[in-house]
Amino acid sequence: TMKHVGLNVAADPFMNSSLVGINGGLVLIVADDPSMHSSQGEQDSRFFADFAMIPCFEPTTQQEAYEMMFEAFEVSEKNHVPVMIRIVTRLAHSRAVVHPFEHDRFVKENTLSKADRMEWMLLPALARKNYEKMLQKQDILTEWSNNARWNPLTINEKRRDLAIVTSGLGRNYYLENLQDYKDLCEKQFQEQGLPSTLHIGTMPYPIDSLKKLAKTAKTILVIEEGMPFLEKMLKGILPQENIIIGKLSGHLPRTGELNPDFVRKALSLEVNPSVLSSSSISDTAANLPSRPPQLCKGCPHADSYSSLNKAVSLLKESAGSDNVAVMADIGCYALGAVPPYNAVETIVCMGASIGMARGAAQAGIKYSFGVIGDSTFIHSGITNLIDAVSTKTPMTVVILDNSIVAMTGCQQTILPSSQLETLVAGLGVEKEHIKVLTTNPSKIDENTRILVEEAEYRGVSVIILVRECLEAFRIRNKAAKAAKV
């Protein structure tokens, strides 16, 4: 499981996994984030599934997500391909009662036979053959999609002006407006009724159903969550005489999440006066006192940024503002970019801080800092630090070690904090320029002094600022108390 930007990091093995002979089911659940609630982009993972030429499921409800998981494994095992299940923020953050399958649906664990070694060697000569096999599977996968129950088609021969295609949560928002839309259609089109509809829950797309739908109407409205991926695809699949409308045509917004109000407008429905529209809610919220995100009270990062800001101020006094750069990374500590700290200048992606600090130093900035969390450093910072060491770049890496993966649920880091110093030394940083410091209010001035000293060093220095996350402390305490009971 991962979110969309996590798939970016996994792109190399992901793309190549479609070319090897998957021996047993392999299913990836990827969560996209329309409206960027906790991400730096709205990218749509369906592009990746299409790029890799693998099947993709897009559930509409929690029940569908549950049931699709079973079929995803079946499709993967039968066709020896990885399968993606693409969800979005709104579905990932929701709950509902799910009716499980009967126990006999579960297959007992079987021992897999060893895979053919030739299926797992992507040397050019073998990779070409595997690529041909993948292309041959496309017709089989398309036929499966044509018959999949996740793609219900409803044809109304009487209504010829419009047809509707939905996918994912777009179907929910259409159904939410269905009764009002039905009333409107009866009023405007009398006995012609509702337009023909096709809901798409799988990729490759069900070509047969799409072509049947295209014959019923000239104009097709596409309601999808995320980028206009399906809308673009239909323009290449369907005849040119079909007019495809949706996000690209301006009938639905290109940015942010879909909601029932946006779909309502696309269906030419008036906003229900008895229900607050999304825009009205936004206007109301704009007049409320703001509560911007901030570090938790007692967060160790607060003291770390206090030390860093003091050090940066001293360095700017001696070298000028343009000779100091502070690059940060993705994590709780990204909140160091906002008041009251305003401590960092860049936040791009996981691991970028060290690489950007190295670039700044090589571009001539005298004092360059890369601020990164302990878990992010292990995830994406190690190779950048190796690069900096190999080029003897004058820069300072500040690792904020709170002993936990705090931002995404307080998971344990894959390497204990006690081993960070050993790891950094093993990457080639000189031991006298690796400083492990406790960060708390009483240590701010001392830590400031050490930050300034290490910034003056004309090579790579690493400062590890250590204090346990308060939430991690609470979890550990709670577990300890429970163990005693």
Specify the residue positions occupied by each region the protein language model found.
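A glycine-rich helix N-cap at a beta->alpha junction
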Residues: 21-31, 108-118, 390-401, 420-433
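Short beta-alpha connecting loops at secondary-structure transitions
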Residues: 32-35, 52-57, 247-252, 292, ...
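Flexible, low-complexity linker and terminal segments
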Residues: 59-295, 300-301, 449-458, 462-485
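Thiamine diphosphate
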Residues: 1-77, 317-406
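Short acidic loop-to-helix transition motifs that present clustered carboxylates
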Residues: 64, 199-207, 228, 332-333, ...
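Acidic, Ser/Thr-rich peripheral helices and adjacent loops at domain boundaries
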Residues: 103-112, 345-348, 352, 412-425, ...
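Active-site lining segments that contact anionic ligands and/or coordinate catalytic metals
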Residues: 80-82, 159-162, 218, 321-323, ...
